[in-house]
UniProtKB/Swiss-Prot annotation:
Residues 9-19, 38-52, 73-93 have a biased composition (Basic and acidic residues). GO terms for biological process: response to abscisic acid. It comes from the Eukaryota. This is Em protein.
């Protein structure tokens, strides 16, 4: 059984070979870099949710989830008659 230190060494080696070993760590060149990237991305999303409020963040996610390579989320929502309240996208004052 591999110890925690050995496991981290193996993950670091894989990361240095270009493999993503930490969810959200895409682009990091080492295990530590990937961990830092993942933490920053998570914190950024939480900050955005706090700025916009839960409802606005949810509406923005709905719109983004509708987008495709051929069509923006707003265009698709309009075409399919899906109601997205963009007034909730504003940050709280």
């Amino acid at each position: 059984m591999a110890s925690g230190q050995q496991e981290r060494s193996q993950l670091d080696r894989k990361a240095r070979e270009g493999e993503t070993v930490v969810p959200g760590g895409t682009g990091g060149k080492s295990l530590e870099a990937q961990e830092n990237l993942a933490e920053g991305r998570s914190r950024g999303g939480q900050t955005r949710r706090e700025q916009m409020g839960e409802e606005g963040y949810s509406q923005m996610g709905r719109k983004g989830g509708l987008s495709t390579n051929d069509e923006s989320g707003g265009d698709r929502a309009a075409r399919e008659g899906i109601d997205i309240d963009e007034s909730k996208f504003k940050t709280k004052s």
